Amino acid sequence: MANSQRKILVTSALPYANGPIHLGHMLEYIQTDIWSRFQKLRGHECHYICADDAHGTPIMLKAQQLGMTPEDMIAQVQKEHEKDFADFNIQFDNFHSTHSDENRELASEIYIKLRDAGYIKTKTISQLFDPEKSMFLPDRFVKGTCPRCKSEDQYGDNCDNCGATYSTTDLIDPKSAVSGATPVMKDTEHFFFDLPSFEGMLKEWINSGSLQQEMANKLGEWFEQGLQQWDISRDAPYFGFEIPDAPGKFFYVWLDAPIGYMGSFKNLCNKRDDLNFDDFWSKDSTAEVYHFIGKDIVYFHSLFWPAMLEGAGLRKPTSVYAHGYVTVNGAKMSKSKGTFIKARTYLDNLDPEYLRYYYAAKLSSRIDDLDLNLEDFAQRVNSDLVGKLVNLASRTAGFISKRFDGKLAKIADTSLTESFLAKQETIANFYETREFGKAMREVMTLADIANAYVADSAPWQLIKDDAKQEEAHQVCTNALNLFRILVTYLKPVLPKLAQDVEAFLQMELTWDNLDVDLAGHEIAKFKALMQRVEMKSIEAIIEASKENLQVTAEPEVKKQDKTPLEQDPISEEISFEDFAKIDLRIARIAKAEHVKEANKLLRLELDLGGETKQVFAGIKSAYAPEDLEGKLTVMVANLAPRQMRFGVSEGMVLAAGPGGKDLWIMEPHEGAQPGMKVK
């Protein structure tokens, strides 16, 4: 039991109820589930809450296409979502829907409190209207050119390329995504939440440590641009909750979606006598509330949501934790390549615990994107889980059953066990701070030590010598005890494996019984706990995920971007003498790390084969630091040092691409050596 029991409410972002869960979504639910399970393992009161996000124009239109009512469609999708989550061993304490009585009541109650406090304004606006469909177009159903960076094919409310947020009417050359028609302007009265009134409070909350530093920095940029009043209403036809005393006007989905966290918890409280809603959501609540989200919805969760709660006299989240996107094999998930993988497709072919472990092994507290490299995935699972972890039990358990009646020995030398137990708080701290990758590395380092102990002791040899039976008994018992400790450390990540090990060891694995004396304890006969990942299973997933290339090719051609040469024409000619001044050298990236308070930069230490230079490179959006270390690249070695806010940059690395994720550093072929001149 933890020294002081905490009361914790934790949420994941609500999956949208118009389609299936895919492996990009699963990153967040696995991350949150691991953290929630860890809190429970430590003895804390922790409630993991989620719901389907079931409102909005996309759901209304999708239901029309399917010939269903929106209510029937979201009910069907919710069943599919719940099945996928359950099969991935996601342990929600409650999974509900935003289309619920609890959510309707809470949304109306919060709105009325905001209205009565003077935080709701009304004004007539000009909005884009689809003349063919006779409907006002929500932000996501208008596409055009970003008014800031001029990127084409961007949504009506924000730009995926530069991150700008703007009014739909600011979009250049807008088109209706519903009909393709050019929308017309039409006046309508809308309701606005007075977000600027909360600027001071938000700045204080953001700088209190409630957000990751990268998030706080990004929000600082939005404050510089100035907070705007937030449009919280939509016109009929719309699937959602009608605004009180405003016929034909509905709450925008992003108003009632985060309230869905509260609605789901309210639903849980209604089912149980031992839970009180106000204990977690009242202004003076001492409980902890944590939201795990993707980096694409930071704006809503870190500005609108806490401001709404403050205005309604409710408590704000303790923290909001954002994560990055999932790429597959180093690229954006692709339906044509078969890397846009649905959760169900994965589950039809592979053990969910494999993906839980792989994601955990690569997750940190930062907002970096995570690459699901399928070859590395197979190798890591086979090496770590099968080759190291399960191998400990498979090499020793049989001897206990066959030679010692399934009973464990009294361990004479407990030094190895004590060294494993000494890592308990280190690993706990890694879980608590969401440094799951560090926790996995710590556990696998211990697994290496345990396997080395078994290899050096060679119980399969000892067992052949009648005089060494007790020693063999000691070694096998010690190995199984170390195995028990390791599986307990991994229990939040691998709950099904832990359950199977509990059946095998005939005891519950808890954080509090790690140091229990197992002398004389009887275990069950060992059964295989985990199979190796076969590449044919991965290939089957890819094939099952591919869509017909001819179907996807045509729309891609229609919206094809300009060629790189058209986007960035060749510069004016320079003389050979000017070019000769540039000293290009091969360099090895000896170290790469994030730069605190910098959104785009990585600090690189470049080895030139006898000299080291420090370079600040704007490649953070495309590379994780650990993926760069050891690589060869090309740098401008004689660039004059430049004093930056973070230190002196002594050169420049060469990279190609338009920016964002689409950046590629120059990597010379094998044979090039640090210090070589590029001619």
Swiss-Prot record:
It comes from the Bacteria. Transmembrane segments: none annotated. Gene3D superfamilies: HUPs, Isoleucyl-tRNA Synthetase, Domain 1, Methionyl-tRNA synthetase, Zn-domain, Nucleic acid-binding proteins. InterPro entries: aa-tRNA-synth_I_CS, Anticodon_Met, Met-tRNA-synth_bsu_C, Met-tRNA_ligase_1, Met-tRNA_synth, Methionyl/Leucyl_tRNA_Synth, MetRS_core, MetRS_Zn. One of its GO terms (molecular function) is tRNA binding. A motif ('KMSKS' region) lies at residues 332-336. PROSITE patterns: AA_TRNA_LIGASE_I, TRBD. Its main location: cytoplasm. Zn(2+) binds at residues 146, 149, 159, 162. Its cofactor is Zn(2+). Its EC number is 6.1.1.10. Pfam families: Anticodon_3 (PF19303), tRNA-synt_1g (PF09334), tRNA_bind (PF01588). NCBIfam families: metG, metG_C_term, PRK00133.1. This is Methionine--tRNA ligase. It comes from Shewanella pealeana (strain ATCC 700345 / ANG-SQ1). The lineage of its organism: Bacteria, Pseudomonadati, Pseudomonadota, Gammaproteobacteria, Alteromonadales.
